[in-house]
Amino acid sequence: MAELKITLKRSVIGRPQNQRATVKALGLGKVNSTVTKPANEAIKGMVNTISHLVDVEEV
C-alpha cells in the first residue's frame, strides 16, 4: 500500500482548535517536522482538513 510523507510547512498559531488537533493527531509538532503515514481514507481526510498547512508527497 502507498504511503504519504506529510511535512508541516506553516505554524498552527492562530488556527482553529480542530486544525491544531488534526496536526497533533498526525504526529506533527514543529514546523518542518515530517511523518510517514499509510494512504488510507482516514489519513487523506485529515490531510484535506489541514492541506493549507502541510506538503504531502506519495512515497
Curated annotation (Swiss-Prot):
The keyword Membrane does not apply. Part of the 50S ribosomal subunit. CDD domains: Ribosomal_L30 (cd01658). One of its GO terms (biological process) is translation. Belongs to the universal ribosomal protein uL30 family. Keywords: Ribonucleoprotein, Ribosomal protein. The keyword Mitochondrion does not apply. GO terms for molecular function: structural constituent of ribosome. GO terms for cellular component: cytosolic large ribosomal subunit. NCBIfam families: rpmD_bact (TIGR01308). InterPro entries: Ribo_uL30_ferredoxin-like_sf (IPR036919), Ribosomal_uL30_bac-type (IPR005996), Ribosomal_uL30_CS (IPR018038), Ribosomal_uL30_ferredoxin-like (IPR016082). HAMAP family: Ribosomal_uL30_B. This is Large ribosomal subunit protein uL30. Gene3D superfamilies: Ribosomal protein L30, ferredoxin-like fold domain.
